Amino acid sequence: MLTDTQRDKWQKDGYVRLESFFAPAAQEDISNFVEDVSCWDVSDDKWLMWFEKTTDNRKIISKIENFLDFHDPLRRLLLEDQRIKSAVDDLLGEDSRRLKELLIFHYPDSGGYLPHQDIYHIPHKLPDRMVHAVVAVGIDDSDPENGGLFFSLGNHKKGVFPMDAGGVIDPQVAETFSWEPVVWKAGDIFIFDDYAPHYSRPNKSNRSRRTLYLVFQRASTGGPTRAEYNVLKRALNPPEGKVADLDNLKPPNGIFYRD
């Protein structure tokens, strides 16, 4: 499925973009299904939701996790043909398993994410690396103007960088990196190594930058199951409850910020 050029890009830079992975009709369905999910009520025991307060004092959804088990059409469209998993298996050189999924909505006037690595095992105080590849499914076009991602190429090979308790890479270290913007179109997928440093700015445009992330482990490594991970997640980073204080919303994680 993948070309040698794509495999080399993954090894060298820590990411690879697969253009037009979803046909236009499938992409439209995915976009509509994601909009369905954005309208769900808060759940105490199923999906996990976080919100943010805009500059004009509105509450907008920021992020949701653990939703695919509760939206059959979206799950089937993304996973049933195994194309995404096959691409991940190819890049990792072995079988993989899906740990989690999340949606970051990045609507206009939403916040950004400071430089970080997707180092899941460290905040959860687990001994072994538990994530090895993250697949970003482009729901909308993405570029720097609407809060698109920036990556530091090749730094996925250098292990874990110094970071604070929230997972933000030490600013003095991050300032030494060269950062490249990553642009994609709706329907593309973008697969990156979880050790690849990246960040995104607040969305100051009038365009959404919705992205659905599928997080994969190597099957040969240990780590929690999906159910075990969701228990860990609720304990470490509690989602919003059914009664929310607009001025005291629960943060989606330690790397999120608003200007």
Language-model segment annotations:
Residues 70, 99, 131-133, 145-147, ...:
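Residues that flank catalytic or metal-binding motifs in active/ligand-binding sites
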Residues 15-17, 114, 134-138, 179-181, ...:
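Conserved hydrophobic/aromatic beta-strand scaffold that supports enzyme active sites
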Residues 125-144, 191, 215-219:
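Short, conserved beta-strand element in jelly-roll/cupin
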Residues 120-125, 177-179:
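Short, P/G- and charge-enriched loop/turn segments at secondary-structure junctions
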Residues 102, 117-119, 137-141, 153:
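Short, structured patches in soluble enzyme cores that scaffold and shape functional sites
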Residues 1-12, 19-115, 121-124, 233:
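Non-heme Fe(II)-dependent double-stranded beta-helix
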